[in-house]
Amino acid sequence: FAIFPQESGEISISPAKFEARVLRDGRITGRKVFESESHTITVNPIPPAPPAYSDAAWLPARDLTIRDNWSREPDALKVGEPISRDITVSALGQLQTQIPVLQPPVVDGLNIYPDKPALDRRLESDGIRGIRTDQYAMIGVEAGDRVLPKVELPWFDIDEREWKVATLPTRTLTVLPTP
C-alpha cells in the first residue's frame, strides 16, 4: 500500500484484514482471518518554500533526478530543421501524476512545441517511483546562437527534511542559415 496524505495532523490507519478459506484434501475445512495492527501517523505541515522559489509546487520525495535527451546533437541546426528534447523527471516516493509540468521557455528565434507527456510508475524495493517525460519539438526560425535557460525544479527531500533544486544547465543551440 502507498499512502499520500492530503492534510497535516494525526491519521489513524485501520488494520488490514485478510480472510482465507482452509482447504484440506480438496475440501474447505474452515476459514482463517489475519489482521494487521492499526497505526497512527503524524503528518507534518508543508514547510515554506525557499524565497527564491516561493511559487514552487509541493513535491516531496526521497530522491529526485532530472535529465534531458536530444533526438540528435543540438550544436549545428539549420533554420527550419526540427529537433526534439525530452526532459525526464524521476521521483522516488511520488506518483507520476504529481510531478509538475515543466513549461517550455520562450526563446527568440526558436519555436518550441510541447508534446503529450509520457507518464510511468515503477514499484521499487524502497517505494513507488513516478516518472514524467515531457517532449518538446524545437525549430530554429532565425540563424544564430539560441540560449535555452537552465531548468530548475524545487523539491522537498523527505529524508533530509530540506528543500533541494534539481537542475539542467543552460544550453546553447547554434542555428545555421539554410544554404
For the regions a language model picked out, list residue spans one by one.
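Surface-exposed interaction/ligand-binding surfaces
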Residues: 1-179
